[in-house]
């Protein structure tokens, strides 16, 4: 049995008097024999509490102070193994078996979080590290196993060893004594190469190599930027819109940004003549997210040929609708979100999965076509819980209800951003007859004339089997 951490070795004579942490004052004051401190069996290898000597002593009871007999062997055997060890530290069986040193236990001598480790490196520890460094001047990067080995030898932690080697390499670089080729940082040297002044004090040829590699990296990054700037395909979040109709490639981001700033200045004058240019990324002024912004622009089939005034209530950017002629490279967001089910929807109908934040824009939709292409939300079952779909109690597949019953009705009275779409079967029609919605806007129809003012709070129905009550 090894000594506990921080246990100082004392002479066997003083052990019996002072360093018995397992006993109270009454046990120490009990009479004991002189042979007890010298017994050969009261060591870490003393019998366990199941032995005959222990049970004989336990029969007397442990409520009173321990009773010691004149027999040294029986008295030493009467203690458990964790109590008998402090009395005899130097038995013949233990010499050399367990060596005690003040920096760790014998079972696991290398402990990272051991508080007994020294906090600063001594001269002999650094001498060991310097010897290893002199032997490996061509490659002064110790591996993980070598660091652990050096940490065990020098009684240092792994972080101390890694920091010492990092400082040693930095010191050699400053003295222009680099005899190794600089290499990239690996997972072993995450803490070693942390400083930003890596090639600052190197020799001129090493500094030249560093500038060449940085120039190559910069060229690669510029090439990647040019590829991303000149691609007309949509980004992963679907924010990029189609570019000019005649150009096969998009403009760079800075040019589009400058032109977009000009568009904001004189949008009222040049709105009908600038529809060939669309902003690179819509700046949303409504509570719509960036994912819904490209969906607000009508698909190419539903886009009117003539100029149409952009409504002030639902616009997300001052840009005009997409060009009339479809360019070669079309936006992938439009292609991915378009669907063949779109002509079956009536005027002003949106997908059922429309969030509550998009309700102000959906109420002012153009009557000529669907403002939202039929998204993949229609193709999967939608389950509505009570905060979002209050009075719809079927909790079934809305797509089957749309196609089989020919029914889709919204109550847009919940147009506030904090509310959701509630669809009461009778309350929707009653609210539609009550009055016009305040967010309603006029739109120019594709034919050129205005349709009569349609109540925005009136539910929109799919053209099909007629209006039928909910299931």
UniProtKB/Swiss-Prot annotation:
The keyword Phosphoprotein applies. SMART domains: HOX, IRO. The keyword Ubl conjugation does not apply. The gene is IRX2. One of its GO terms (molecular function) is RNA polymerase II cis-regulatory region sequence-specific DNA binding. Keywords: DNA-binding, Homeobox, Nucleus, Phosphoprotein. It is found in: Nucleus. One of its GO terms (biological process) is regulation of transcription by RNA polymerase II. Pfam families: Homeobox_KN (PF05920). Gene3D superfamilies: Homeodomain-like. It comes from the Eukaryota. Residues 112-175 bind DNA. PROSITE patterns: HOMEOBOX_1, HOMEOBOX_2. Residues 462-471 have a biased composition (Gly residues). The modification Phosphoserine is found at residue 186. GO terms for cellular component: chromatin; nucleus. Residues 261-273 have a biased composition (Acidic residues). This is Iroquois-class homeodomain protein IRX-2. It comes from Homo sapiens (Human). Belongs to the TALE/IRO homeobox family. Residues 195-209 have a biased composition (Basic and acidic residues). Residues 176-373, 424-471 are annotated as: Disordered.
